[in-house]
């Protein structure tokens, strides 16, 4: 059966979504989960774009062992050099270089003739091959490019040593029939097409990314690129979970396999949603909250008699199911460590100890500790960066009443090691807390977005607060969870400030 490689670009193309801002620890955590999911290639970032991206790609390349790690680069020698420095520690060094090929891009963006574009692409591939055994070349905006020109330039880059040719529908303009036909044409006309892999990369501007990707597979694509939950610029990329499940459920038709561990899909989706702060729409295919819900009485009756009457996908297939009671307040450190490892967390002793302390606090207050609670608690510990002095909330107290002005008092340990007490009022309890904590930093903090969601069910569920701020003209998002939503809100606000400090430290001391 033909094998389709899954190329995940959640950490590169996905992170280009408006409002997404991942730090290195979060990217590493997502990369490790993508490895557990079984993706063939992880595009970890664009190393030449910033010190932060370089650091993330470098560390992911050294961490991930069972998936190929790649970095994006323009067809520029400096970009390729930087990507090699970031990727060279990987098991199989891989680079993804790109150059636009559509008339509108060549004329207005590149300001180059078709011949100059071919020359630049060939030189870049030859240069990259000096470092990398695996070189993927992308024809940016391929679908809107002239077909004959695509054949010309692809002939040259294949001869130069490219091992994969990517054919992106960069602006999501294609229809399934047209996109499939383009693959058929290229595979029939590019010299040496049988010696390289052709890859599909679809955007969802017209809502056809999944259909277009499947059409490419039907017409010979050997690799598909996309993101978890379909995140990405504008309307997003193709959702890889949709492709993986569609190819599995309709294996009778497509006759291909992916190597994806389908039972890891739900956990991967939840992790990406949590760390990117992008909420999954309830009716999202495969991973939405309502994906397996039946409201109609006729449907419910049928499912009760035989689930296959209305369910073509078993919830268990993607790791969906009842969240069991896993630990309680009498559970010991060894059991906690074992459960953390079962859930896929490889925490340092220090982080495990901190997580265990938080677990015991929660267990004393909460009747039942669910797997979802543990995932939230362990994720928060795993993504903490400890190499930069940060603010730490020691205490927060709010005085509130319908006839009183809300007043917040906080005691905070500053990055300099000083304990500082701050007080402020606000129109409500949350604003009072934010106004109080804003006094800790020299410049104004603008809260762009704030929300609290429930983790799990019941009146004793954890509340997860997410705060998106703009400070020094830079947007940063913080998060925290607690049974007390005011405490969670205060810690989320400080988490956003701390993430800004980490960014500034990295900018001042690049890797």
Swiss-Prot record:
Residues 4-266 form the Pyruvate carboxyltransferase domain. GO terms for molecular function: 2-isopropylmalate synthase activity; acetyl-CoA C-acetyltransferase activity; manganese ion binding. It catalyses: 3-methyl-2-oxobutanoate + acetyl-CoA + H2O = (2S)-2-isopropylmalate + CoA + H(+). Residues 392-511 are annotated as: Regulatory domain. Pathway: Amino-acid biosynthesis; L-leucine biosynthesis; L-leucine from 3-methyl-2-oxobutanoate: step 1/4. One of its GO terms (biological process) is L-leucine biosynthetic process. It is found in: Cytoplasm. GO terms for cellular component: cytoplasm. Keywords: Amino-acid biosynthesis, Branched-chain amino acid biosynthesis, Cytoplasm, Leucine biosynthesis, Manganese, Metal-binding, Transferase. PROSITE patterns: AIPM_HOMOCIT_SYNTH_1, AIPM_HOMOCIT_SYNTH_2, PYR_CT. Homodimer. Belongs to the alpha-IPM synthase/homocitrate synthase family. LeuA type 1 subfamily. This is 2-isopropylmalate synthase. It comes from Lysinibacillus sphaericus (strain C3-41). The gene is leuA.
């Amino acid at each position: 059966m033909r094998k389709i490689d899954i190329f995940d670009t959640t950490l590169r193309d996905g992170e280009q979504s408006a409002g997404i801002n991942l730090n290195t620890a979060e990217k590493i955590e997502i990369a490790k989960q993508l490895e557990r999911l079984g993706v063939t290639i992880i595009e970890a970032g664009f190393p030449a774009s910033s010190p932060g991206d370089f650091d993330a790609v470098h560390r992911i390349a050294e961490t991930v062992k069972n998936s190929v790690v790649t970095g994006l680069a323009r067809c520029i020698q400096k970009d390729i050099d930087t990507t090699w420095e970031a990727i060279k520690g990987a098991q199989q060094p891989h680079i993804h270089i790109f150059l636009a090929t559509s008339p509108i891009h060549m004329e207005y963006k590149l300001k180059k003739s078709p011949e100059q574009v071919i020359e630049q692409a060939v030189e870049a591939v030859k240069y990259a091959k000096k470092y990398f055994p695996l070189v993927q070349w992308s024809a940016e905006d391929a679908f809107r490019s002239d077909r004959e020109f695509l054949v010309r330039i692809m002939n040259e880059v294949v001869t130069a040593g490219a091992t994969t040719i990517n054919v992106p529908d960069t602006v999501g303009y294609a229809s399934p029939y047209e996109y499939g036909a383009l693959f058929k044409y290229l595979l029939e006309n590019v010299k040496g097409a049988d010696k390289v892999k052709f890859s599909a990369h679809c955007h969802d501007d017209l809502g056809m990314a999944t259909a277009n990707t499947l059409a490419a597979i039907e017409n010979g694509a050997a690799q598909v690129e996309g993101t978890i939950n379909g995140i990405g610029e504008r309307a997003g990329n193709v959702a890889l979970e949709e492709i993986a499940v569609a190819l599995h459920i309709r294996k009778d038709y497509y006759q291909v396999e992916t190597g994806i561990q389908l039972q890891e899909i739900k956990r991967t989706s939840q992790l990406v949603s949590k760390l990117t702060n992008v909420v999954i729409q309830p009716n999202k295919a495969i991973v939405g909250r309502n994906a397996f819900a039946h409201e109609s009485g006729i449907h419910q009756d049928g499912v009760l008699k035989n689930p296959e009457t209305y369910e073509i996908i078993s919830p268990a297939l993607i790791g969906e199911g009842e969240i069991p009671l896993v630990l309680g307040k009498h559970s010991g450190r060894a059991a906690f460590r074992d459960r953390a490892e079962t859930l896929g967390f490889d925490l340092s002793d220090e982080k495990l100890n901190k997580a265990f302390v938080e677990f015991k606090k929660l267990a004393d207050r909460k009747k039942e500790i669910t797997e979802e609670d543990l995932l939230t608690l362990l994720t928060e510990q795993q993504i903490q960066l400890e190499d930069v002095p940060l603010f730490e909330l020691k205490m927060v107290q709010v005085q509130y009443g319908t006839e009183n002005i809300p007043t917040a008092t906080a005691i905070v340990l500053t990055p300099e090691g000083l304990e500082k007490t701050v007080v402020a009022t606000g129109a409500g309890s949350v604003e009072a807390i934010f106004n109080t904590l804003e006094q800790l930093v020299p410049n104004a903090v603008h809260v762009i977005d704030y929300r609290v969601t429930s983790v799990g069910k019941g009146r004793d569920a954890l509340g997860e607060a997410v705060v998106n701020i703009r400070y020094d003209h830079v947007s940063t998002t913080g998060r925290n969870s607690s049974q007390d939503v005011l405490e969670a809100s205060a810690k989320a606000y400080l988490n956003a400030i701390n993430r800004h400090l980490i960014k500034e430290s990295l900018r001042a001391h690049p890797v």
